[in-house]
Regions:
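Active-site and ligand/interface coordination hotspots across diverse enzymes
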Residues: 1-63
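A short, flexible beta-alpha/helix-coil linker loop
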Residues: 53-56, 89, 131
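Glycine/proline-rich loop-helix segments at beta-alpha junctions forming the active-site rim
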Residues: 97-188
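Short connector loops at secondary-structure junctions
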Residues: 79-97
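Short hydrophobic segments within beta-strands
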Residues: 50, 84, 126-127
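Membrane-helix interface/capping segments
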Residues: 60-61, 93-101
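Short acidic (Asp/Glu) patches
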Residues: 33, 62-70, 102-112
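A short mixed-secondary-structure module that forms the rim of ligand-binding clefts
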Residues: 55-77
Length: 188
């Protein structure tokens, strides 16, 4: 079965799966723009995680980070998880973003997908972690996305915590007995 193609990116081919679990990815699958998982019918709405970059998870396969996000989303009582990223380039090592042979942010419309996902959710968890500090000039992407989200959906922004250098904590090893906190109320 062929995958539906969407023209969201000015002619750049993108495919998106349909159904309770899926992803929007470039045709070559080097970029992932959006991932979603319907977890159950009992929860109340969508929880979105905004992280650094996608790893190996795709429309049907989960990686450890996605499994952690699914666990937290269920724990907090949401029915659906969506995941967006500062960078769309898929890699298991964030440092590879510096050496990508193309722009690791993907198409400029990636920011619109991030904003839309956050606006469509009841809660958005900022969670890109400390790896952003090692990305040199790419670090500016976090400030760009954060500013856009502060403008378009400030009341929906949460995080697990902030690390010593101010970045929102990554969810992979987060204890499940800790609740998310308002992102904008934390001082750096």
């Amino acid at each position: 079965m062929s995958k539906p193609q969407l023209d969201l990116f000015g002619g750049q081919p993108v495919h998106a799966s349909r159904g309770p679990s899926g992803a929007m990815m470039s045709l070559d699958e080097r970029h992932r723009y959006l991932l979603w998982r319907k977890l159950d019918d009992e929860g109340h709405g969508v929880c979105t995680f905004v992280m650094l970059n996608p790893s190996t998870a795709d429309a049907t396969n989960d990686d450890p980070t996605i499994r952690s996000c699914m666990r937290l989303t269920r724990l907090w009582g949401y029915s659906t998880l969506t995941v967006v990223n500062l960078f769309s380039w898929r890699t298991s090592d964030a440092l590879d973003l510096r050496a990508a042979d193309e722009d690791p942010t993907g198409d400029p419309k990636n920011l619109l997908i991030v904003i839309d996902a956050v606006q469509q959710s009841k809660m958005a968890v900022m969670a890109w972690g400390s790896s952003i500090r090692r990305l040199g000039p790419l670090r500016a992407r976090a400030a760009e996305v954060e500013a856009a989200l502060r403008e378009h959906a400030p009341d929906k922004l949460y995080c697990l915590n902030r690390n010593r250098t101010g970045e929102p904590t990554h969810p992979l090893f987060w204890r499940k007995d800790r609740a998310p906190i308002r992102f904008l109320e934390l001082s750096l």
